[in-house]
Amino acid sequence: TKEDILDVIDYARKRSVTIVPEIEMPGHATAALSAYPELSCTGGPHEVETLWGIHKEVYCAGNEETFVFLENILREVSEIFPGPYIHIGGDECPKTRWENRPKSQKRIEDENLKQEHQLKSYFIKRIEK
């Protein structure tokens, strides 16, 4: 719960420890995409992964609602955690879901990107603001 998180933050503060929360994106997002399949490239359905690994489901970088959702999450996290940083992951993001998907390909075209690797860079740069 939020109260539990605040207890952990208080415990850390008393010991001069800064907690850096991590919200993974654009990959490692299957749990969120199970709840919000419309933010994926395929529209789901998705199941929460129970095994460690790199999974093919990622947030759709061509869907504006993806950014609205993630910006709201980051805003809430920044209001809870007093530290200056939020880790957004960014590693291990397969780009296969962005290939040949109309929204992702349109974003690539609209932003004058050359391919899906640049779309990932666009995603990270947009979120880091």
Which residues fall in each region the model found?
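Substrate-binding cleft of carbohydrate-active enzyme catalytic domains
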Residues: 1-129
